[in-house]
Amino acid sequence: MAAQCGGYMNQSDPGSNSERSADSPLPGSEDDSPGSAAPHDPEWREERFRVDRKKLETMLQAAAEGKGKSGEDFFQKIMEETNTQIAWPSKLKIGAKSKKDPHIKVSGKKENVKEAKERIMSVLDTKSNRVTLKMDVSHTEHSHVIGKGGNNIKKVMEETGCHIHFPDSNRNNQAEKSNQVSIAGQPAGVESARVRIRELLPLVLMFELPIAGILQPIPDPNSPTIQQISQTYNITVSFKQRSRVYGATVIVRGSQNNTSAVKEGTAMLLEHLAGSLASAIPVSTQLDIAAQHHLFMMGRNGCNIKHIMQRTGAQIHFPDPNNPLKKSTVYLQGTIESVCLARQYLMGCLPLVLMFDMKEEIEVEPQCITQLMEQLDVFISIKPKPKQPSKSVIVKSVERNALNMYEARKCLLGLDSSGVTITNQSTISCPIPMNCHGLDILAAGLGLSGLGLLGPNTLSVNSTTAQNSLLNALNSSVSPLHSPSSAAPSPTLWATSLANTSNATGFPAIPHLMIPSAAQATLTNFLLSGVPNYGQNTPSPPPGLTPVDVHMNGLHSECKKVTSVLNGHVKPTNMKYGTISSSSLGDKVLNTNLAEASRQSNNHSSAEEVNSKTDSEGCNDAFVEVGMPRSPSHSANTKDLKQMLNSTKAPCPTRQTVKLLHGTKNSHLHTAERLLSDSEMSPTEGPMTDKKAPGSERAAERAAAQHNCEMARFTSQSAYGNMQAYDYEQKKLLATKAMLKKPVVTEVRTPTNTWSGLGFSKSMPAETIKELRRANHVPYKPTMSTTYENSPMSLSRSNSREQLGNGSDSDNWRERNGIDSSHNDYSSSIGSPKRKQNKSAEHYLSSSNYMDCISSLTGSNGCNLNSSFKGSDLPELFSKLGLGKYTDIFQQQEIDLQTFLTLTDQDLKELGITTFGARRKMLLAISELNKNRRKLFEPTNIRSSFLEGGASGRLPRQYHTDIASVSGRW
């Protein structure tokens, strides 16, 4: 390691070089060693180590100028006080070209040698804070980075205080070229040098001129217009004749640190040369990436490249590995913006190696190393150095994760700071400076910054939905993130930069810095909000549940809230979030009920009595949660919910009110064990699934719910409609079906505001819709219920303008709409929930949660579709199985239900269904449906007649959500 830091190549100890007399101690250069006594003394030791050349030169210079202690005095004092002999290069040439660190030799008894070394290194230490970083830079671009006469790289070395080494082997070896560049110095300087090198890289964009005629001449690069563009945007323009004579290739050259000007100049040139055809001409560029890194960068099944292409819209082509000529050239094609962005993302996937020394006495437990590797998404290797009292540490990762590599070093060495500030982060790793300090490390830990998920395009492309996406992220749970890298997603999130720890070794503090997985899920969804195909696409909450007047400047304040939560409330023992918001809604409403609820936690029979009693009194005791958050970080948004509650005249007497309040109170009720149990939920379960663990907590909440139901029986029920929950999954399914349905030419399509403000549209910006609705003062009223008492086909009891029928207030959908259940077969498939509950009341009440109950009713595999599924479309099937988030994947691949029934496990893997649980559900559903295929596809489909106008066809059509999706009437 020392040799690499000194010479940056694997060299032998420089004992035989020309500077031996100056840089290394010579026998007899100091006082004579203690004769023959040394060999006979078993405790006699000799130790040779390097010291910092610049510090030693400074000491000698200061002594020569009479401004400080001379080297002679310094070493003589140590020899006398420690009873050792020290040999040092007294004739060191000051200002020599050599950058090698000189050696010091200390002889004496073991304890004395150790003490002398510590005293010398306390003044002349060179390696305690020195690191070496190896990065990948295409060998074809080395000369461009170095500059004429080495001017570019010299300037970088001077400004960063680092030594930068380019491989010497490239000069002589024409067959194999090395792309590895080494940077050695202090961590902050090394990271700054890495960023500077990336900025010095050339940026070359190319496009083909359209063929306007056979005899069309190649444009003159010296023409006034082209020269004006070149000078204005600091680019070089050249033309290359194509081999087939007609047309030419335009090559625009610039620098990475001038990216915006290069893009503007290319656009101007394209418009000048192609005119109206400019927008149709693709732009291309290429990257030279070592062939051995291709598979690593592409990811498993090419997932990295697919994500980048989907994110940017550019096409990326990796070469055939068997092509001997251009096996390392990667081609990118698309619009100017997409090509440049994809190029940045690819560079963020390039490998990085960080090397540094660790003291021999520092011991690191293997489990701590494993924990660090998982949390920071890095690889760590620690090996002892031969014949030296130190260890060599190697940390490997990718460029987008550079900050976490320094975090790993900080933790391993027990430092107070990583030595790298956020301002040093590369524009390639993160294309925008982040306003939220706390999210920098979070983004790096999730491996997102390199993919631009926190870049300017996130804010610009998705700015129309940023308001809802932020709140939606904080108000919902997400399935575990599928990391774009081939490594498995880490179960927890590292937040060392968010906590102030000054522990000497750094390792006892590790458990203090672990954020619960529930909070990680919230933060993950916050980071991924608005980004297609990353995480779960949860629809935006309706205006009735979350405020719609949040503006983009609220993003910064929300970031601060999240950061403050993490800073103040990551505790080592019971990770409660009880003090997140002292004025939280749950504190004010439920604090009087908690004690009694806990006393009743073990009285299960009394809870069952209350269940049956409140059912008869109309208080709904279904176990489906309302669409409110469980996340600990939600308490920051309780103010808006309080305002909504205050607008109602009396509290709601239903279980829904209680569960709505529990949504904010859960963060105070549950410990770290409860939070961790949430994170172990199957990734195939939807966000509306009840995720509570079985046991006393369930009993306590149920008892509290029943108590609140009894207390609320005497209050008014006028505000019931305003507090109904909203079934996002069902709405999203119906919207998907409506969008997939082909319009019938002869059918009149009547516009309604059924889908207004829900964010399901894929063609119109949500912000525009909101502005129109605000301008027209159109209020939003929820139109569906999520309770189990109301079937999925239920109509809301709110004041919605779509509500029709006989005006009955009955809980039953058919009774309110005047439809006799005996007339249709489909109604029996969904059944009356009360009948279902009566048939299996014992089983229903003994289940720990809603999903347990449902699985007991449907069968062991959860795919008993004989009577419950008679549809013919894939979205409905996936929604029923809790796999709604995978619907878009199958729609993009144009896979319908018929094709789905032919898929195998391997087919599902190729489609990108990497989660085993999701694939298992799909395969079980395929098996079940294939068994009943003949019955499933019978021509008689009573459901359609039921929806279009009842079994007889004479009932008036009901213009509500379900019919809008099936009949095509909007």
Curated annotation (Swiss-Prot):
Enumerate the UniProt keywords alphabetically: Developmental protein, Repeat, RNA-binding
* Pfam families given in the database record: KH_1 (PF00013), KH_BICC1 (PF22985), KH_BICC1_1st (PF24234), SAM_1 (PF00536)
Q: Tell me which InterPro entries the record gives.
A: BICC1_KH, BICC1_KH-I_rpt1, BICC1_KH-I_rpt2, BICC1_KH-I_rpt3, BICC1_SAM_dom, KH_dom, KH_dom_type_1, KH_dom_type_1_sf
Q: Name one GO cellular component term.
A: cytoplasm
Q: Which cysteines are joined by disulfide bonds?
A: none
Q: Which residues form the SAM domain?
A: 869-932
The KH domain covers 130-197, 282-346
> Which Gene3D superfamilies does this entry report, sorted A to Z?
3.30.310.270, K Homology domain, type 1, Transcription Factor, Ets-1
| UniProt keyword Cell division, yes or no | no
Question: Compositional bias (Polar residues) spans?
Answer: 9-19, 596-605, 783-810, 819-831
The keyword tRNA processing is annotated on this UniProt entry: no
Q: Where is the composition biased (Basic and acidic residues)?
A: 40-50, 606-616
Molecular function as annotated in GO = RNA binding
Region annotation (Disordered) ranges: 1-50, 596-638, 677-696, 773-841
Supply the SUPFAM superfamilies for this chain: Eukaryotic type KH-domain (KH-domain type I), SAM/Pointed domain
Q: Record's PROSITE patterns?
A: KH_TYPE_1, SAM_DOMAIN
General function of this protein? Putative RNA-binding protein. May be involved in regulating gene expression during embryonic development. Seems to be involved in endoderm formation. Ectopic expression results in endoderm formation in the absence of mesoderm induction.
Which protein family is it in? Belongs to the BicC family.
The name on file for this protein is Protein bicaudal C homolog 1-B
